[in-house]
């Protein structure tokens, strides 16, 4: 039995949930989300509680779906009430970011500025060297943050690049430090 999947999801006030077969729609103060789940999951709405189960819990694939489906629905509810955000730090001389309309424009040492268009329901705020990406869909927020980070991964010698706030970059000693150490 799935430890995560068997827990009930309590729906907070101000949030409406509609279940039509395998399709779950969640509407809240920050927006609305919709997701279709696998045919082996059974989602039941009882008043202000949602219970998730699977057709055959003894199979490994279904057990995996059980906990996943419950967490995805829980994240949908949290997204429309509180929202999600990821913070990225930019380190490097001349590296900067700015928001222009619905695009994030990054100067990362390339010959041209990199322009990324925000997906639906995603926004960003730039303060000095910190980019805060926020939205109601946890998957989209994480994916967009990962896309931005991939543009300039932190290098191990000086730590220049884009990293998540609080992420620790393993640093390497340069040639000069390594040569002095060997003598």
What are these regions (language model features)?
Residues 2-146, 150-183:
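N-terminal intrinsically disordered, cationic/polar leader segments
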């Amino acid at each position: 039995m799935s430890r995560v999947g068997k827990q009930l999801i309590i729906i907070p006030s101000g949030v409406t949930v509609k279940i039509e077969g395998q399709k779950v729609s969640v509407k809240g103060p920050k927006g609305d989300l919709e997701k279709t789940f696998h045919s082996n999951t059974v989602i039941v709405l009882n008043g202000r509680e949602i219970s998730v189960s699977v057709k055959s819990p003894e199979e490994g694939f279904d057990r995996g779906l059980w906990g996943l489906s419950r967490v995805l629905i829980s994240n949908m509810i949290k997204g429309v009430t509180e929202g999600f955000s990821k913070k990225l730090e930019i380190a490097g001389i001349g590296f900067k970011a700015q928001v222009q309309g619905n695009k994030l424009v990054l100067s990362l040492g390339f010959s041209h500025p990199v322009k990324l268009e925000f997906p639906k329901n995603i926004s960003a705020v730039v303060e000095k060297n910190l980019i805060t990406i926020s939205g109601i869909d946890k998957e989209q927020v994480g994916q967009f943050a990962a896309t931005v980070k991939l543009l300039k991964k932190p290098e191990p010698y000086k730590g220049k690049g884009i990293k998540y706030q609080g992420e620790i970059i393993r640093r390497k000693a340069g040639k000069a430090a390594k040569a002095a150490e060997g003598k």
